[in-house]
């Protein structure tokens, strides 16, 4: 099983847009990421995103890029400051590949918890538009398969 951890694309500042929608660069970066995922023929069972508009936009762009159009789903527990343990428990029960679209510092803590079993140890330098693919071994351990940044 694989999970794809995505930090939303670059967004506008609150002073320009109270919803902090994706910027033009952020939209372009995520469209390129979607094209990359489509070329790799990645199959994802579910795409989950936080409540923030920029995460939903990122998820929608990626969903439209994948060959088998997936519906995106809001999922509680993916906000920037949410605890990671509940989502780790949920991920470990999954049998199908999923994508989570969220924010820092949550994504950094999540990958630390999954790979190093310590959410306080950072191992990936996420920037807006980063994706990290993790794969679960037969022993139930998570390993970084690949990472792509804009």
Model-identified regions with their sequence ranges:
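Short, solvent-exposed aromatic-acidic interface loops
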Residues: 145-150
